[in-house]
Amino acid sequence: MHRYRTHTCEQLRPENVGETVRLSGWVHRKRDHGNLLFVDLRDHYGLTQVVCDVSSAVFKTLEAVRAESVVSVTGTVVARTAETANAKLPTGAIEVKAQTVEVLSQSEVLPMQVAGDQEYPEDMRLTYRFLDLRREDVHANMVLRSKVISSLRRRMTDQGFLEYQTPILTASSPEGARDFLVPSRIHPGKFYALPQAPQQFKQMLMVSGFDRYFQVAPCFRDEDSRADRSPGEFYQLDFEMSFVTQEDVFAAIEPVLVGVFEEFGGDRAVTPAPFPRIPYDEAMLKFGSDKPDLRNPLRNADVTEHFADGGFGLFSKQIALGSVVRAIPAPGAAGRPRGWYDKLNEWARESGAGGLGYVVFEEAGPKGPIAKNLEPERVEAIRQALDLKAGDSVFFACDKPLKAAKFSGLVRERICDDLGLRETGVFRFCWTVDFPMYEMNEETGQIEFSHNPFSMPQGEMEALETMDPLAIKAYQYDIVCNGIELSSGAIRNHLPEIMYKAFEIAGYPKEEVEARFGGMLRAFKFGAPPHGGSAPGIDRIVMLLADEPNIREVILFPMNGQAQDLLMQAPNTVSDKQLKELHIKLDLPKKALKVDKGEAAGDKAE
């Protein structure tokens, strides 16, 4: 017989009755019925009930062992009676009558229970992550993650992609977030950076003649935590293709995503390929976001013309100063009490807007502050434009175009949730396309890249030389599912002269571009194919499939919201010797200078 087990805790069935078996696992739960002791033994695969009576030689051993101790049990498989069988367990028709028990590892008193559904503070869960990972739902999420990654790899390989590994230590580059820097001992005063993405390397792979690349790539960004973003590191399905158009990229990744979501999404419907393509300008108008949630049936509309020079002076004055008006429909909301409208108006003010005007369409006619002041024919034109009927309402956001778009998007989501309109049990995919190449920094007045600086502008050099930069579109695109951005991608700018010009418009002189991207630019000067790609976020894919609201629920050892690893106590201080080897002297805020004995005294390090 095997030293530890003949079967897992999920394998035994009625056909095993009468066999002598050995199981090993964790003591999940104990139930003492006086003369009988029941122990649920758990391993990675499942649960098996172990039983012994008071006359058994192992009774005292099992009675004394704590929950989550690791034990090995040898015994006989017996059938449960019809009354005691547990149809919810795969092993619920049998139990193991214990003959010998070996305690392999005794557990201390638990700071948090593994069995049961009790909720614990996140800091406790992350401090004792090894216990948290034993809990059924969390454990299942990690198994799901592993299976999803395996499926992604298989599907990419089936599409003709080959997996290559790119460097983890690289050079710092301006990709939109702060870099994690690694000091060089051999080159004092110089630093490596952990890659925010394998962007330049995968493009140079295309220049090197590799046609279809992919990688389950770790990415590192020093940015704040969000529900759908873990601080520090994340993983993405990074891929790149040569000699492709935008549609070729879409056609390559859509079947991979559809396949994975159908494989692991249960009975939830998945948008079939090809996914809807929504231009950025349309997305901002209709959805108030470049990450539209298509489960929300509401569609916003521009009604500026119906308020311009009209009787509702508050809006007409703002329109004259460059503002626009967005309308957000609220079907069936006419019967809502006045308090609901007042609460929405208060919420709008708390969100930084001036308020939230509305019109209620009743059988007797339109009602509300705007309807009292705006000419009836204009109110009717708005009703027709949004295809509203008696019993519906409509809300309005008036502001400068970008602010009006973003706020109307928030209103659209709030109304959808208040009215219970969001579709459930589905994964709604779309592409957001035709992003602007540039945007204006409102604080500095400087033109900046709005998305990926390595994207090819639509119209190429002619567009850069002849068009208003803010009117130039790029071959940039995002994959969105249920309002969550899974990936950004682009057809790349592979021509050095176009790249120099694109960066010049954003305020980067040629010398700085060469200093920051010299390796890639040199590669482009020796024959670069047109190429493009994307990089769907694996953590977010698993979060959606697991139906988890927080991305940390699908990461094995995540940092908390303050970018701390509570299990490993990272970040931590290092010794004076380590700092001196790296030629680093710390200049810390006074409140951070206190260190424990034996740790680094940063103000003394050279």
Curated annotation (Swiss-Prot):
GO terms for cellular component: cytoplasm
Catalytic activity: tRNA(Asx) + L-aspartate + ATP = L-aspartyl-tRNA(Asx) + AMP + diphosphate
A GO molecular-function annotation: aspartate-tRNA ligase activity
Annotated compartments: Cytoplasm
InterPro entries assigned: Aa-tRNA-synt_II, aa-tRNA-synth_II, aa-tRNA-synth_II/BPL/LPL, Asp-tRNA-ligase_1, Asp-tRNA-ligase_1_N, Asp/Asn-tRNA-synth_IIb, AspRS_core, GAD-like_sf
Site (Important for tRNA non-discrimination): 33
Region Aspartate, residue ranges: 199-202
Subunit structure, interactors included: Homodimer.
Role noted for this protein: Aspartyl-tRNA synthetase with relaxed tRNA specificity since it is able to aspartylate not only its cognate tRNA(Asp) but also tRNA(Asn). Reaction proceeds in two steps: L-aspartate is first activated by ATP to form Asp-AMP and then transferred to the acceptor end of tRNA(Asp/Asn).
HAMAP family, per the entry: Asp_tRNA_synth_type1
Protein name: Aspartate--tRNA(Asp/Asn) ligase
Organism name: Rhodospirillum rubrum (strain ATCC 11170 / ATH 1.1.1 / DSM 467 / LMG 4362 / NCIMB 8255 / S1)
